């Protein structure tokens, strides 16, 4: 289905004039034809790979640009939003004046005027009560394809009466010449106005700005209604038992929730309301670096016609070298969720979660592969949002870089982190849910915990088998760890066993504990935060 009646005249309301043609809600075949046209140049051009998926490049931006993110500070947002210039914690919510907003808006509308435009109408949020109707406007076919993959695709009847709650205008080709005099970070911008309900994009072609932009908006609207808004994946077992997996990029959200034994609800963004857990999205956005059909068969098989690859290296014969990270380590693929066989249908939602899993990839080798959290520890580790990356291996630099990202998604939070923690804990308590901290990273041997062992741990949590295990307490962090689990080498479960001596582990543990303590200081500006210090590591 192509144009279903949006006229160039109707775009004038957004400030876009002289539109040559509106390609409204194109179907996948039309998008495929448009994005692979021989006449396209530069980053607009898509290449057909051997699987049938189209590959595109996003240019110098191969990830989000958090320093170029702004929100208009006005009556709507002044007292509710978590601003970068308030309180102890640092964040990316930089305030923008109404005047600068107008200037950015006219840059984008000028860029989009006089063009042939793609307009895609979508839903963000699987629950009709709280979903947003979002309209995307772009001049680039593959960007229209990206949002069609990633958001929920309304049926024809809903499209016929579609009225957007929020509009995203993507002007990737335009940049802001006045950024210095306006006191902005660069010529590129991702700007939001919660009063006008518009997102503007300029200078960056990265698809994820549209996906995560809407996540930031949902993260503002839902908790204010008492609905948890979560950076997590989610799945459900045959008995209707729901699990959610929180974690930062690269910790295993997509991989671990895509499980042949369980139905996928979604891989990245969810809400939790009075009915249960629901997906915000209609697609998945998986990392593809070092992807193999052996380790991740479901994701590998999802890469076919209608999937969209980003920044991968395509060989002359159309095959993809997933091991090649020369453009970026953040190579990605977006695909509609139904490319995974085992999903919740027809709507990506299920009941209340009974298991909440925090994924961390601890490159320091200190934390156990799995531990059970008390209610206070749950809030503490949720607010800490710890993971650690191994630095580049050049010149022998292997010192890990710790990342503390509140709620396992600080980059996307628009309210104070404690608001998300409070809503989550309320939902967990009402559902009688348990929380587990799972380390998918390293131990003292310098080897990463294998995916096979992590899956065995997750299976033990989901089956309830882990509840019967004898436990020990890890000192300093005071974490309760099982002594044995089926399918897991017992020695692995206590990180101290992977060190030459307990003292060697303790030295590393003290250093990491200090980082936790220093990081958590920013939450002690509220009585609730101050009270949680007790649940953290103690030196």
From Swiss-Prot:
Substrate binds at residues 64, 206, 212, 332. Its main location: cytoplasm. InterPro entries: PEP_carboxykinase_ATP (IPR001272), PEP_carboxykinase_C (IPR013035), PEP_carboxykinase_N (IPR008210), PEPCK_ATP_CS (IPR015994). Mn(2+) binds at residues 212, 231, 268. GO terms for molecular function: ATP binding; metal ion binding; phosphoenolpyruvate carboxykinase (ATP) activity. SUPFAM superfamilies: PEP carboxykinase N-terminal domain, PEP carboxykinase-like. Its EC number is 4.1.1.49. Its cofactor is Mn(2+). GO terms for cellular component: cytosol. Pathway: Carbohydrate biosynthesis; gluconeogenesis. It is found in: Cytoplasm. Monomer. HAMAP family: PEPCK_ATP (MF_00453). Belongs to the phosphoenolpyruvate carboxykinase (ATP) family. This is Phosphoenolpyruvate carboxykinase (ATP). It comes from Erwinia tasmaniensis (strain DSM 17950 / CFBP 7177 / CIP 109463 / NCPPB 4357 / Et1/99).
């Amino acid at each position: 289905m192509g144009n279903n009646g949006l006229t160039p005249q109707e775009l004038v309301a957004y400030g876009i004039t002289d539109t040559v043609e509106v390609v409204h809600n194109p179907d996948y075949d039309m998008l495929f034809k448009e994005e692979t046209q021989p006449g396209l140049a530069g980053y607009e051009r898509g290449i057909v790979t051997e699987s049938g998926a189209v590959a595109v490049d996003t240019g110098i931006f191969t990830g989000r640009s958090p320093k170029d993110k702004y929100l208009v500070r006005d009556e709507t947002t002044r007292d509710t939003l978590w601003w970068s210039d308030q309180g102890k914690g640092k964040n990316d919510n930089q305030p923008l004046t109404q005047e600068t907003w107008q200037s950015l808006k006219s840059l984008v509308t000028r860029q989009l005027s006089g063009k042939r435009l793609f307009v895609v109408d979508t839903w963000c949020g699987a629950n009709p009560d709280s979903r947003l109707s979002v309209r995307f406007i772009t001049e680039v076919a593959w960007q229209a394809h990206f949002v069609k993959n990633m958001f929920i695709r309304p049926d024809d009847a809903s499209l016929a009466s579609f009225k957007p709650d929020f509009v995203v205008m993507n002007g990737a080709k335009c940049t802001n010449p006045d950024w210095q005099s306006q006191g902005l970070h660069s010529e590129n911008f991702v700007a939001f106005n919660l009063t006008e309900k518009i997102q503007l994009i300029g200078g960056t072609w990265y698809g994820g700005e549209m996906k995560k932009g809407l996540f930031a908006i949902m993260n503002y609207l839902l908790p204010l209604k008492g609905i948890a808004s979560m950076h997590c994946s989610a799945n459900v077992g045959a008995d209707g038992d729901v699990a959610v997996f929180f974690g930062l990029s690269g910790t295993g959200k997509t991989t671990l929730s895509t499980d042949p034994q369980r139905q996928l609800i979604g891989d990245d963004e969810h809400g939790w309301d009075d009915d249960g857990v629901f997906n915000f999205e209609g697609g998945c956005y998986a990392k593809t670096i070092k992807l193999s059909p052996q380790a991740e068969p479901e994701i590998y098989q999802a890469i076919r016609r209608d999937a969209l690859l980003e920044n991968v290296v395509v060989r002359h014969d159309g095959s993809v070298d997933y091991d090649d990270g020369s453009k970026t380590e953040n190579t990605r693929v977006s695909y509609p969720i139904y490319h995974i066989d085992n999903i919740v249908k027809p709507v990506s939602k299920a009941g209340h979660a009974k298991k909440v899993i925090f994924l961390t990839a601890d490159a320091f080798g200190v934390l156990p592969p799995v531990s059970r959290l008390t209610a206070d520890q749950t809030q503490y580790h949720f607010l800490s949002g710890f993971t650690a990356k191994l630095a580049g291996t050049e010149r022998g630099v292997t010192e890990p870089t710790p990342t503390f990202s509140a709620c396992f998604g600080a980059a996307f939070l628009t309210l104070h982190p404690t608001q998300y923690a409070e809503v989550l804990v309320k939902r967990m308590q009402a559902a009688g849910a348990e929380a587990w901290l799972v380390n998918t990273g390293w131990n003292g041997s310098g080897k990463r915990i294998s995916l096979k062992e992590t899956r065995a741990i997750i299976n033990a949590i989901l089956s309830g088998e882990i509840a019967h295990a004898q436990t020990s307490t890890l000192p300093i962090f005071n974490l309760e760890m099982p002594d044995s689990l089926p399918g897991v080498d017992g020695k692995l479960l206590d990180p101290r066993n992977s060190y030459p001596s307990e003292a060697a582990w303790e030295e590393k543990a003290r250093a990491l504990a200090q980082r936790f303590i220093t990081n958590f200081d920013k939450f002690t500006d509220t009585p609730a935060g101050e009270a949680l210090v007790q649940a953290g590591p103690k030196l």
